[in-house]
């Protein structure tokens, strides 16, 4: 699936988050208690994709998926020499 807009990316992220939460058999209420994020915020996020970054970090951590957040802007190893050359031109 090619994501074209920030809104589409946010909705797709919310969908994947909901699937992860469900796979771990964690209810929104239990996640709210564990994370300190209000139930209404979780419900809004899963429905619209809208959430503050800090709340997303808290939810992700409560699900034991801290590495997902840590990997967001991690240094990435270039896949090819062309990528290295392009990067040096910027």
Explain the meaning of each model-derived region.
Residues 1-23, 72:
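A short, Lys/Arg-rich alpha-helix, primarily the initiator
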Residues 25-43:
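Short alpha-helical DNA-recognition segment
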Residues 48-61:
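Short, basic-rich loop-to-helix N-cap that marks the start of a DNA-contacting helix
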């Amino acid at each position: 699936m090619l994501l074209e807009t920030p809104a589409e990316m946010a909705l797709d992220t919310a969908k994947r988050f909901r699937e992860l939460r469900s796979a771990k058999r964690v209810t929104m209420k239990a996640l709210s208690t564990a994370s300190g994020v209000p139930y209404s915020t979780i419900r809004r996020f899963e429905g619209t994709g809208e959430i503050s970054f800090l709340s997303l970090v808290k939810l992700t951590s409560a699900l034991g998926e801290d590495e997902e957040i840590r990997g967001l802007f991690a240094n990435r190893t270039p896949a090819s020499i062309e990528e290295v050359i392009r990067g040096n031109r910027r």
